[in-house]
């Protein structure tokens, strides 16, 4: 019998769904993938058993990139594949057959943010067309460490161009070279940045694990918005040599992964004292080759957790998830100190920007000179001129006022710079994290990592509803974000913040919280949501 119900065409269905806040899942159905959500340990077990090779695994990830990164959902997260990855994987397979296994990363495919030097056939460009086609002469120290550990570098990831330090009106995840990276959870939402490509790619199982970098928020925010664990280490735990710089006082590389265990396996391989980065000398005796020993399910029991209420309150759905996370930690045996506010939050913002502008000019000019970048783009001044000459390709949406403000700064001997740096350290360290931790005898401070992902908007730029990376970033202290829930299909993260070199304690707390809540779920490549 023919139905008497009115026919609804596709356009009307979409309109009705949008009007009710429903999500629309039908346009992008990712094909089944054997290694979706696969952990480092699970892949190692298969390679040890002889049922999987590293070369086959790399091939599978490359095939998945073709299906969902360059077509289908078209995430645009990987800016370049390593043309030598299959050969490297085959060589590591041969080592395994001879009985040599370098460690837990042997044969594991990994992606790197495209501001980390690799002395191979891949370019290192910070997403800028100015450096397109230019390879670095040698590996960054952290890349040397990863290769030595047996990791297979399968590609470079897109990023917010110049790690989001070109314009205050930028759109996270966009670069002139790589275009716009999309959030795999809801495709019209932003992945945050600047480690946008690493976050989207790892979330979508385009690699097992990935490396990002952070000056302020560039690991924590994209990890939070893409449902990942992200670790922003103490400055000096991981070398910065061979990484395109913004700030010598705040920059660090860090792991991004789908689980705490995978993130800390990667962290252990990244640490080490590097003579080319004097900040790492302070890590001697404070780093560990195996951070998985701190992953204990009972780590919350007896811990004192401070709730930074003045770092919440920016979104009702985030607050609801945050309160649920606090309840879970209490259930796990933690003593909750609520509130344990950080009184200096936001008071260092102007000083931080001054510090970053000074340090960016000094650090970038030194980096470009050391790397031997071809003229005329071998100085900040030359890059500014290049962008002006190529504005249609490099500046279609936003300009370069941060570049120009940095170029106007003087040397790091300027009194204004030294005063700003001292102010940042006092406000974020002495009167900030250190004071709160000591006053309340805390093991960690917790806060929501960020608000929900916003719609990507190239005309108006990013629309952050809130974020809490700055206090740890300005202090140079560690922070770990762990999935804590969702706001209408959009992932939300919980940040654990501590004092210098407290990674072991934070890792334990983050792991126990992860195991207690199991809040992460894989992305479904939904085209849009209309709420949150």
What are these regions (language model features)?
Residues 126, 132, 315-316, 454-462:
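Glycine/threonine-rich flexible loop motifs
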Residues 23-26, 31-216, 234, 258, ...:
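Gly/Ser-rich catalytic/binding loops embedded in alpha/beta enzyme cores
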Residues 148, 152, 203-309, 323-332, ...:
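Structural helix-boundary/capping segments
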Residues 2-21:
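N-terminal secretory signal peptides and thylakoid transit peptides that target proteins
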Residues 107-126, 293-308, 357-429, 434, ...:
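Short helix-loop capping/hinge segments that flank enzyme active sites or metal/cofactor-binding pockets
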Residues 125-128, 182-186, 194, 244-252, ...:
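Flexible glycine/proline-enriched surface loops and loop-helix/loop-strand junctions
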Residues 440, 452-470:
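Short, surface-exposed loop/helix-turn segments at secondary-structure junctions
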């Amino acid at each position: 019998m023919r139905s008497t119900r009115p026919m609804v065409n596709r356009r009307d269905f979409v309109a009705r769904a949008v009007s009710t806040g429903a999500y629309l899942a039908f346009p992008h159905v990712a094909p089944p993938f054997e290694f979706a959500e696969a952990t480092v340990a699970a892949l190692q077990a298969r390679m040890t058993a002889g049922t999987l090779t590293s070369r086959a695994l790399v091939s599978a990830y490359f095939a998945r990139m073709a299906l969902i990164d360059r077509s289908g959902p078209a995430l645009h997260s990987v800016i370049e594949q390593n043309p030598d990855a299959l050969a490297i994987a085959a060589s590591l397979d041969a080592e395994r057959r001879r009985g040599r296994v370098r460690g837990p990363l042997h044969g594991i495919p990994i992606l790197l943010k495209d501001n980390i030097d690799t002395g191979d056939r891949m370019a290192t460009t910070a997403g800028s067309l100015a450096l397109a086609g230019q390879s670095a002469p040698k590996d960054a120290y952290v890349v040397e460490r990863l290769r030595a550990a047996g990791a297979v570098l399968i590609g470079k990831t897109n990023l917010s161009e110049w790690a989001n330090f070109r314009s205050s009106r930028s759109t996270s995840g966009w670069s002139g070279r790589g275009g716009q990276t999309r959030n795999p959870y809801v495709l019209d939402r932003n992945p945050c940045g600047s480690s946008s490509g690493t976050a989207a790619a790892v979330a979508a199982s385009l690699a097992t694990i990935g490396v990002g970098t952070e000056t302020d928020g560039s690991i924590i925010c994209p990890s939070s918005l893409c449902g990942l664990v992200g670790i922003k280490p103490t400055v000096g735990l991981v070398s910065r040599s061979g990484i395109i710089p913004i700030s010598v006082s705040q920059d660090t590389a860090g792991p991004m992964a789908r689980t705490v265990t995978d993130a800390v396996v990667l962290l252990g391989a990244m640490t080490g004292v590097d003579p080319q980065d004097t900040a790492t000398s302070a890590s001697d005796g404070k780093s560990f080759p195996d951070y998985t020993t701190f992953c204990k399910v009972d780590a919350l029991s007896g811990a004192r957790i401070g709730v930074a209420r003045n770092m919440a309150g920016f979104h009702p759905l985030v607050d609801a998830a945050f309160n649920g996370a606090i309840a879970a930690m209490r259930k796990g045996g933690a003593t909750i100190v609520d509130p344990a506010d950080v009184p200096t939050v936001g008071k260092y913002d102007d000083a931080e920007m001054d510090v970053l502008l000074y340090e960016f000019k000094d650090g970038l000019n030194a980096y470009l000179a050391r790397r031997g970048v071809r003229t005329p783009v071998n100085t900040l001044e030359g890059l500014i001129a290049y962008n002006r000459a190529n504005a249609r390709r490099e500046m279609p949406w936003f300009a370069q006022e941060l570049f120009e403000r940095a170029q106007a700064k003087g040397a790091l001997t300027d009194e204004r710079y030294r005063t700003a740096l001292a102010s940042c350290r006092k406000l974020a360290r002495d009167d900030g994290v250190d004071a709160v931790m000591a006053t309340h005898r805390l093991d960690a401070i917790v806060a929501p990592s960020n608000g929900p992902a916003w719609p990507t908007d190239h005309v108006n730029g990013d629309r952050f509803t809130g974020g809490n990376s700055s206090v740890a970033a300005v202090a140079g202290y560690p922070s770990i974000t762990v999935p804590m829930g969702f706001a209408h299909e959009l992932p939300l993260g919980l940040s654990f913040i501590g004092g210098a070199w407290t990674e072991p304690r934070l890792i334990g707390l983050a792991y126990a919280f992860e195991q207690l809540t199991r809040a992460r779920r894989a992305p479904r490549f939904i085209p849009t949501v209309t709420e949150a």
